[in-house]
Amino acid sequence: MFETSSGLGVKTKQIGKPTPRSILCRSPEMDALIRAECAKLIDDWKQKAFEYDGLIYMMLKEETEGVVPLYIGKAETIGKTNGNLSINIKNIKTDTQKFARWGDNYKYHIGDLSAAVLLGHDPKEIKYKYIDWAGSLFEKNATDAPVFKRKVFFWTMAWSSKNLGPWIEFGPTRLTFLEYLLIGLASSAFGDVLLNREGRNRA
């Protein structure tokens, strides 16, 4: 998921002007996967086929019993106005600020996680949600040398409205409902590690 230097150490880079800040580096494989799956969404939207609802994605962590889900989310093809292509994927080939919700900017996963983990960020940009993420993923935060506790992985795919979800009796499953179902299942099976705050099954 992230680009590593040695062992479980995670590489960082500087972005922003006039005052640069450090952010965590996504792996080239993660970047390529997101761009490839978003290309399907963009082509589908341009052709007005409207087969794909968007991306479903998971962040996962290696545990002794295997790989377990840490966070489940989605990035929809259509934006909030007039059927336009979502700004989260619109310029995915060249722009990493939003990057299908995994962008480098604040208010996106990489930017906000970096604020919680790395030194030098404005305290007002450090969100409780990502403090939780940082505690789950990294040996320590407020550091300039981030190190994973365990290996972390990323998976995503372009989700067709014709695809079946985990409950095949429901038939073709739309992206929003799929996300709801997957979070519910993961919270039941892996509730002690799942980082999603919304959509969890109540104990």
Where are these regions (language model features)?
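Boundary/linker segments flanking structured domains
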Residues: M1-L70, K74-A203
